Amino acid sequence: MTTKLKGLKELGNTSDPLRTVSYQVRTKMSDYEDDNTDVQSLTVEEEYELWNSNVPVMYEFVSETKLTWPSLTIQWLPSDGQSPEQSLIFGTHTAGEEVNYLKVATINLPAGIAGLDQGDEEDEANDHSSFAIANKFPHIEEVIRARYMPANSNIIATINGKGTISIFDRTLEESKAQVSTLAFHKENGYGLAFNPHISGELLSGSDDTTVALWDIEAAKKPKSILTSHDDIVNDVKWHEFESNVFGTVSEDKTLQVHDKRVRLEPVKKLPTASPFNTLSFSKHSRNLLAAAGVDSQIYLYDMRDMSSPLHVMSGHQDSVTTVEFSPHTDGIICSSGSDRRAIIWDLTQIGAEQSQDDADDGAPELMMMHAGHRSPVNEFSFNPQIPWLLASTEEDNVIQAWKVSMKLVNASPPAISDPSLLV
């Protein structure tokens, strides 16, 4: 059965506080026709309609929800893998017009999208997902970043526009859910990351140029403070294999790698031509690091020798806001940017031969471009349980959940990448 795709274009200017349009895609590759439209000449709305018409060839599932206020942050929560219900966290940015909230939403996926075995007829009867707010907790100032603690996903940390960190327990009732406040930073903060190896250990980075290391289970003062940056700290991330190692990027045009056992100076400090906004350590290869920023490029580094990048990937047309490695598939990266795009990259295709037509469409490692947003993408998140399922949030009050077509995934030619990228 082929499901007709409809309804997304009706969502754009609704005044409803929360409205979702979603569908599970059931189609054949032959249903897609390329009309050779010149994308460069299209308006934002025309680009969106073109993307909507191409959805059948690119996705298994798409859900779009219009919010009352924009969210600057989004993250899937882990699930038990036995139910089609998935949860995610996001926040509000009301610019002082209303109370801000940290929110927990649930989205009920079609069973097939969630990877659960269900009969075709029953699955088709449940093609549409539902998006609902399960919990919301009052929040002082806007929610800049929200992150769950890997050791206990009921514990969520946030950082606001004044640099204040709040710790929530989402199992508690609304009035008691904020269990502690961590005050040190003097300005806005975009860096926030729990150590995946040590329960309660949290990093924060701020516009005040400092990075703070916290133990949220022991004290309300930082364990240590790093002052090695000279300008705004844009992002902080923990290494996926080493519990003492983390990275930071800053407006001071440096990428720094730190070892928390060495308190004074970074163990590696890389000057960059322009500031990086974001960085990510590979979840599969202990020496691989990605970073990106205002020049729109994605840089790949070998941590054993960071004097020059292993490879630079081009595809975005504006500043990159987020970059993350897939938790499921080695060599897969996603990036999002102010150009309204999220791009999935396949590092195994670096250096692959291309026809001229393919080369005109982008580098061989550019696997897929998600063009469903109509304003800059603030952040995205890989679902930790379901491969190829992502959620993304944009400036224009919209959250999208989307799963890449398995036909697109399986269409990739054999891997020929430089093995050094995957060590």
Curated annotation (Swiss-Prot):
Site (Important for interaction with HAT1): L288
InterPro entries: Histone-bd_RBBP4-like_N, WD40/YVTN_repeat-like_dom_sf, WD40_repeat_CS, WD40_repeat_dom_sf, WD40_rpt, WD_repeat_RBAP46/RBAP48/MSI1
Start and stop residues of the WD repeats: 138-174, 175-224, 228-268, 271-311, 315-355, 372-412
Subunit architecture: Component of the HAT-B complex composed of at least HAT1 and HAT2. The HAT-B complex binds to histone H4 tail.
This protein's UniProt keywords: Chromatin regulator, Cytoplasm, Nucleus, Repeat, WD repeat
Name the record gives this protein: Histone acetyltransferase type B subunit 2
Highest rank taxon of the organism: Eukaryota
Compartments it resides in: Cytoplasm; Nucleus
GO molecular function: histone acetyltransferase activity; histone binding
Cellular component aspect of the GO annotation: chromosome, telomeric region; cytoplasm; histone acetyltransferase complex; nucleus; Rpd3L complex; Rpd3L-Expanded complex
Biological function: Regulatory subunit of the histone acetylase B (HAT-B) complex. The complex acetylates 'Lys-12' of histone H4 which is required for telomeric silencing.
BP terms from Gene Ontology: chromatin remodeling; regulation of DNA-templated transcription; subtelomeric heterochromatin formation
Family: Belongs to the WD repeat RBAP46/RBAP48/MSI1 family.
Main location: cytoplasm
PANTHER family with a match to the protein in the record: WD40 REPEAT FAMILY
Pfam families documented for this protein: CAF1C_H4-bd, WD40
SUPFAM superfamilies assigned to the protein according to its UniProt record, in alphabetical order: WD40 repeat-like (SSF50978)
SMART domains registered for this protein in UniProt: WD40
Region entry Interaction with the histone H4 N-terminus, spans: 357-361
